[in-house]
Structures are given as C-alpha cells and as structure tokens.
Amino acid sequence: MQVSVETTQGLGRRVTITIAADSIETAVKSELVNVAKKVRIDGFRKGKVPMNIVAQRYGASVRQDVLGDLMSRNFIDAIIKEKINPAGAPTYVPGEYKLGEDFTYSVEFEVYPEVELQGLEAIEVEKPIVEVTDADVDGMLDTLRKQQATWKEKDGAVEAEDRVTIDFTGSVDGEEFEGGKASDFVLAMGQGRMIPGFEDGIKGHKAGEEFTIDVTFPEEYHAENLKGKAAKFAINLKKVEERELPELTAEFIKRFGVEDGSVEGLRAEVRKNMERELKSAIRNRVKSQAIEGLVKANDIDVPAALIDSEIDVLRRQAAQRFGGNEKQALELPRELFEEQAKRRVVVGLLLGEVIRTNELKADEERVKGLIEEMASAYEDPKEVIEFYSKNKELMDNMRNVALEEQAVEAVLAKAKVTEKETTFNELMNQQA
C-alpha cells in the first residue's frame, strides 16, 4: 500500500492510496473460497461447486465488495499510521479500476484543528455572592399565594395588580387598524402585556365607565405600519376584579407537599428549593462567563462536517419540541441553527482540549452529588437515584456533565475571578 497526504484547504485533507494488484487478487480469491462454501447451484452439492463456476457467477460482485472493503480498511490503516484524526465522515473518490493492475483511490475529509489554549489568565469572571434571606422567603410565599389566588369583583377604581375586562377599539389618525379591536378582553394589570401607556390609562377608572386613552406605539413594534405612531383607544371598562390571596392554612400548605401543614415547614421547604435554584444559577453564571472568555481568547478553525452534524441535532431537537417528525426537521433552514451549532462545536473543542491537557476524568463523587442534587427536586429522590444508577446512558450523560464542570473549574483556576454581592431576586431576574 502506497499513501500520500495533502492539504486541500484549511482543515481539508486528501489521502491518496494505491493498493497493489496482487493484494486485490489475494483478497478476491479468499472471498470466492468463502462464497463457494455457502452457495447452492443446481447439479452440485453445497460446498462442491467448482471454483471456475463460482468465479464466473459471482466474481464481479465479489471483486466490487472486496474493493470497497480494501478501500475502507486501507484508509483506516493509513490514518492510524499518519496519526490523522478525521472530523466527520470521509468521502471516497475511486480511481479507474483495471483487472490485474494496481488500484489508486483518494479519500477527502476534514481534520480536527490543533488547539493550543491561550489567554486563560486574562479571562475575567464575576462570581455572585448571594444569601437567601427571610425577606426572600417571604417574597416567594407571596408569589405562591398569588399563583393560587382567586378573583373577586370590586366597585372601586382600577389599581396596579387588578384584573379588568374591557372592550377596546384602536385608531390611528381616526382610522381603525387591523388587530386593534377586541371584546370582553381580560387583562391582568402589571404584567406588561400591552404597549406603554395602555394600562396607565385604565388605572383610576371604575367599571361601567367609557373613556379614551392616548398612546404611542414603540419604534420597535412588530407591525411596520404602527411603529412610532400616536394612537387612540376607546375603552369600555366592563368589570374590575381584585386578587384574593389564600390564607396560609394547613390545607393550603399541604398542597406543596408539607405533611405537617405548618408555616414553619413550608418556609423550610421553600428556602431549600430557593437555595437549590440559587446554587444552580450561580454555577451557570460563572460557567457562562468562563466559557465566553475561553471562546474569545481562542479563535479556532471549525470543521464544517462537525457544524453540519450539530445542525442536524438542533433541527431534530427543534422538531421534537414542536411535535414535528424527522422529515420536517430536515426541512428547517440551516441558517436558523448555524451560529448556535458553530458555537457549540467551538465550545466542545476548547473544553475537550482543557480536559486533555489537564488529564481530567469524571469524578465519581461529583457524579453522585449531581445526581443527588437533581433528585432532590423530585417527590421520591431515592427512586430517581436508583433509576439513574441502573441506566448506563443516563450515568454516562451525568459523567459528561461532571467532566464539563471540572473543565470549567480548570479554566477558573487560571482566570481572574472576583466576587460581587447581590440579591436573590437580582440574580434570578438576570437569569430570566
């Protein structure tokens, strides 16, 4: 076997391989012997068919199969010998084959980039320092009560957190516009669903009143014909409701899995959940900064084959989220996923190099801790932990998560990490 390697462009490579004629003939004869042992031909017992008849009937197809097998095996031998690491599936380009002559073919593919990590010491990471306070727990309890609230009709004026039922008709320069009219429209105040000024114009009014409010559509409004336009809305305020929060009774508290129904038990459960969310949020914030710094400090070439493969993964994930099938997934435009796919490949290559240079292996204690942390959010953590322990694929996925965390920590060990005190709500709002 003769081998030559050339660079085509960037990460592209072409390996040209020549297989000696006698190697081909030896492989063909060997395969014909195997075929002769299995075939049945009228007039001959199984395994007793003369070789010249076997060759006459099956020689062409056997030779084709043998050439395909030799091309594959010789390519693998060549890249091992040349220490080449292909990225993605190779493309085989066969030359002209003539019986009794050497056979030359080429294989085109991309290789993984050579990554030399740099700039780790210049990466800046700000780590949030946060404590879950009693006031934070109080706020979360209020949120839980609001989620379970009922609505009661009232006679008074509309306030910031009320709910209203309205008819409205919008117009610009005296002309009604498409989508600007609704009847019995239910609007929960304070959620920012409407354009600026709309809710403010309703506050202070009472049920039964009809009035007009003046607003201006934002410049970034989605409808081109309304961007930046002054508009009037004729409002018929039909009903005003106020929120009635449930009391923290034992019955209410037990809905959240607190068996003793006590306020203290609910506060403890809420605090535990908030601290788990907080730990995850801090970890994600630090990780995202470390990875962003790593990407900015290391500009690397990316094999197109890996990007294509990642685009296929993202397409299928998108189709699954929206209930589509594989055919519909492949019809989604690649432009929707190209940037995200490239970044995921870059991050994977860089973290892979961090893992390689630091000789990292998944810490089994960390894996165990991650599973326990994840399981604590479920009603029966022990059942979840046992389920994971018996599923090799899930365990391998969790080992990959642990290994990625270890790689990020290796980056952080060299980066400039500063601490900044903040509040639970500030951090969570930034995560949203």
Curated annotation (Swiss-Prot):
It holds the Pfam family FKBP_C. PANTHER family: TRIGGER FACTOR CHAPERONE AND PEPTIDYL-PROLYL CIS/TRANS ISOMERASE, TRIGGER FACTOR-LIKE PROTEIN TIG, CHLOROPLASTIC. Residues 1-112 are annotated as: Ribosome-binding. The keyword Translocase does not apply. One of its GO terms (molecular function) is ribosome binding. Involved in protein export. Acts as a chaperone by maintaining the newly synthesized secretory and non-secretory proteins in an open conformation. Binds to 3 regions of unfolded substrate PhoA, preferring aromatic and hydrophobic residues, keeping it stretched out and unable to form aggregates. Binds to nascent polypeptide chains via ribosomal protein L23. Functions as a peptidyl-prolyl cis-trans isomerase in vitro, this activity is dispensible in vivo for chaperone activity. Residues 161-246 form the PPIase FKBP-type domain. Residues 148-251 are annotated as: Dispensable for chaperone activity, although its removal significantly decreases antiaggregation activity. Keywords: ADP-ribosylation, Cell cycle, Cell division, Chaperone, Cytoplasm, Isomerase, Rotamase. It catalyses: [protein]-peptidylproline (omega=180) = [protein]-peptidylproline (omega=0). One of its GO terms (cellular component) is cytosol. Homodimer and monomer. In vivo most of the ribosomes are in complex with monomeric TF; binding as a dimer has also been suggested. Uncomplexed TF is in a monomer-dimer equilibrium with approximately two thirds of TF existing in a dimeric state; binding to substrate PhoA induces monomerization, 3 TF monomers bind somewhat independently to a single substrate molecule. TF and SRP can simultaneously bind to ribosomes; TF binding is abolished when SRP is bound to FtsY in the presence of a non-hydrolyzable GTP analog. Contacts ribosomal proteins L23 and L29. Belongs to the FKBP-type PPIase family. Tig subfamily. The modification ADP-ribosylarginine is found at R45. Its EC number is 5.2.1.8. Disruption phenotype: Non-essential; synthetic lethality is seen in a triple tig-dnaK-dnaJ disruption, although this depends on temperature (triple disruptions grow slowly at 20 and 34 degrees Celsius but not at all at 43 degrees) and strain background. GO terms for biological process: 'de novo' cotranslational protein folding; cell division; chaperone-mediated protein folding; protein transport; protein unfolding; response to heat; stress response to copper ion. This is Trigger factor. Signal peptide: none annotated. Consists of 3 domains; the N-terminus (residues 1-112) binds the ribosome, the middle domain (residues 150-246) has PPIase activity, while the discontinuous C-terminus (residues 113-149 and 247-432) binds substrate and has intrinsic chaperone activity on its own. (Microbial infection) ADP-ribosylated by the phage T4 protein ModB. It is found in: Cytoplasm.
